[in-house]
């Protein structure tokens, strides 16, 4: 369900996760999948993703053009600042905001961590990670 319209103006965006799974908004990579619920064409100023990371995955990431906030809803892991070696545990109820474009490593330690992620500026939906782990 893409949203409600009045004379061509979007008045409310309603989207179910089940509509995103398996669609062009569902991106997958080695050890992760991102169900991209809100994207740039929704004109909300950020994108909103329901992301799953497979237990045992170690993702090397660096978003040079985006800021990211992550809220953990299931599983456990940790985020490592590659430059400083600082480590922060991630578990349900913990938010981690990557506000300096830092190189990071995300490790999925227990279960498949589920994260609600917001990116600004918003992603268009067709991005894939480059060699540096960014978009």
Indicate where each model-derived feature is located.
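Short beta-strand His + acidic residue motifs that chelate non-heme Fe in jelly-roll/DSBH
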Residues: 59-61, 79-80, 98, 103-110
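Short, conserved beta-strand element in jelly-roll/cupin
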Residues: 50-53, 64-79
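A short hydrophobic beta-strand segment most commonly corresponding to one strand
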Residues: 69, 97, 111-127
């Amino acid at each position: 369900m893409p949203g409600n319209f009045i004379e061509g103006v979007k008045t409310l965006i309603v989207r179910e996760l089940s509509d995103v799974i398996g669609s062009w908004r569902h991106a997958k990579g080695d050890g992760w999948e991102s169900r991209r619920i809100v994207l740039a064409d929704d004109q909300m100023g950020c994108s909103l993703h329901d992301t799953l990371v497979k237990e045992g995955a170690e993702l090397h990431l660096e978003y040079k053009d985006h800021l990211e906030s992550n809220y953990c809803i299931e599983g456990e892991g940790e985020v490592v600042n590659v430059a400083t070696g600082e480590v922060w545990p991630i578990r349900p109820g913990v938010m981690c905001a990557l506000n300096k474009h830092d190189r990071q490593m995300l490790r999925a330690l227990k279960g498949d961590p589920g994260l609600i992620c917001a990116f600004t500026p918003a992603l268009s939906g067709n991005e894939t990670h480059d060699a540096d782990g960014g978009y």
